[in-house]
Each structure stands twice: as structure tokens, then as C-alpha cells.
């Protein structure tokens, strides 16, 4: 291979060997230290590749002729979902996926915080059919509605046929929705404000929510909506109205049917609204919550602060073993459904605070609840803890922290800060909450 030739879009490079497999699921090859990330190429596989795009940090390429296959490779079951970038690890057998994620987590913790102990990594019971929620894109083009996933790194629709990440009944429901849409296409074409549709599903209770995500308040016809109703299903249909950049949710309108879904974690039931956060892999969630219960060794005199609590699944799940729970969540809908769920489960020792976690912790120093017996549970979004939350921890007396993270990189960043506050990492465990993807859920216990 001539390494000195100019790298450009469309260039074909022969006999490339992937010497690494990146965290994001690309085979990695370098020319003069410049990385080329190759889709659908595992470590040690050899292929002819074509450069698709280039920026200042790396190039992206695709395989045009794979010449060797890794023993870790398996056939793609669902090519549409893979093309959309939703299952980047589907090319790898499941045992190898677990080993890969464990290696990523182990290397990151060793490099960033000096953790040298073994990190156990818990596989999912189901490597497919585990999701209880999906969102499909909605595009009107040439007087036609296209609905499906965006092809990876494009705005080209991959039409929905099935998704291996949801189960058969959920797939059937989505296909029936699309069939109804096709049968009434002319009426739906007037709704140019719809940009995506979110589906939520409770398998145990056979309940569905459909949420139309829109950019203005043009009301969707109840006559059209009612055609989605089936006698054997409990369905709720909503319209979310966003600002024009599709980022900020302005308003939610209930159009038809049920207000919520019902889920069960262990012996506890939870009500979940159209915009309430709920983990998408329920079986893994139960494993994590049981592990938290074991790790905390609760005596009964503790107060637990459930921070970024969502509908307070963790707080409610542990409440009967605690003196009290303080649930802190900014989202109004989530707080309302958390209150409903607490009442449903006869949990009375829980206090709900609808407030941004940063603002709450800024004014926490004089709070009478904070003492050595109490526990903090953090389950933040992907960007991790706000610096002001970490700063506030300097002045409060909490000996135990549970940190549940969906982003290992922001997790280790925050752990460095907590270690600086004299906390010690006592336990680390990884969970495969998202099989076929590179995402990793990590549970950490800290003490001081």
C-alpha cells in the first residue's frame, strides 16, 4: 500500500487490517497516525475499504470487500436497524460484546482513577427484544410520508420493517400503526408539523403510548387517531409540541385514551407518562436495584436522597427499608407520576422536591437531613454531575454515595472529583443495559 498518496473521499484502499475496535464500534486503521474508522470491520479482519468522509481528526470508511472474518463475527439479523446505527455491535457475537464492554470499562477505570480490581460485567437476559421504547422519524417528501429510522449520519429514512431491539408484539403494533397511516395517507399529509413518533410499551400490562412529536400546535384529528384503537389494547395518544429547533418541549396535549403506562419492578408498580424517564431494559434495572440494596446494607435509620430521580423508581423500591426518601427531580410530569406511584405502593415516607439538582445542592448546607447516616443516589443524564453539585458535596456529611451512570467517560470524570473530596471507590460493576450497542451502564459505590 502506498502510504504517501493523498487521502480523499472516494479513495479505495486495499488490504486494510483493523488493529483496534473502537468504543463506538468501528474497526481502526491508521495512515501516518491518522485514524480511519471503518464501519462493519472487527479487530484483525482484513478488507478493501472506501473513504466516505474526512475531517481534521479522522476519516470514515466502509467495507467494499471483506477478505477475512473474525471468529467473533456473526451475521446481521436486522440490516435496517444496523444501517440506522442503532445496533453497531450486532456484527459481534454476544459473548464477545460482553468481553469488549468489560475491557472498555476496565481500561478506562485503570487509566483514569487507578482502579485495578476486577470489574464484573452483567449480561442482559435478553440480547434482543429488550427495549420498551422506540422513536421513528417522520419525513414528508414528494407528497409521501416516510417513517422509520434515519440511516446513520444522514437524514435518509430507512423504512421501518422490524426492529430486533423490541419484541414481536411491539413490532406488530408499530407495523399496524404504519399500516393505518398508509391507509389514511392523504389525511396525514396535512400534518407537516410532525417530525417523529415515539412508541412506549408495557409488555406485562399490554399497554401502549403513541407520542407525536411536532413543531407547532396544529391539532391532530381525533377521527384519525381513533383508528389506532383496538379492543384488546390499552392505548394512550399524545402530542408533544416543541420549538422550531425540535429541542425544547413547550407543551404536551393528551389526544386520546390512557394517561400512562403501568410497569412492575419486583413487587412495585409504577405509572409512567409520555415524557417520564424509565429505563428501557426492565430486567437489567431490577438486577441493578437489588444490587444497590445489597451494597447499602440499610439499617433503617437512614435518609436517602434520590437525585435526578425521574419517577423515583430507586427511592420507592428502597423506601420500606429506610427512615425516609427525599426525591429530587426537575421534570414536573415525572414528579407527578412519582407521587402516584408512591401512593400505589403504600410508600408514605417519601418527600418529593421538584427542583433542579444543582439549585437544590447549592442551598443544602443547612438542611437538617444531612448527616453521616444518610445516603446519596445519583442517576444523572449522560453529561454527568454538574460542577456545582460536586462543589456542594465538600460541605455536607454523607458517607455513602451510589452513582449509576450510562456514560463511563463522564462517570470517571466525576469520580476523580469525588475522590478529591476524600471518597473512596469501594465497588464497580458494569451492566449490559443496551445489548447490540456500545452503551454501558455502570454502578459504583463510594464511601468516606
Residue ranges and their predicted role:
Residues 27-32, 148-152, 338:
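Short, acidic/hydrophobic/Gly-rich beta-strand patch recurrent on exposed beta strands
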Residues 156-195, 202-205, 216-241:
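Internal alpha/beta scaffold segment
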Residues 1-80, 113, 359:
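Terminal RNA-binding accessory module
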Residues 120-127, 195-200, 243, 429-433:
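Short, solvent-exposed loop/turn elements at beta->coil junctions and helix N-caps
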Residues 4-10, 15, 20-25, 217-448:
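Rossmann-like S-adenosyl-L-methionine
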Residues 44, 166, 281:
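Short, conserved phosphate/pyrophosphate- and ester-handling motifs at nucleotide-, phospho-/glycolipid
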Residues 64-190:
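Extended interfacial segments that mediate partner engagement and assembly in macromolecular machines
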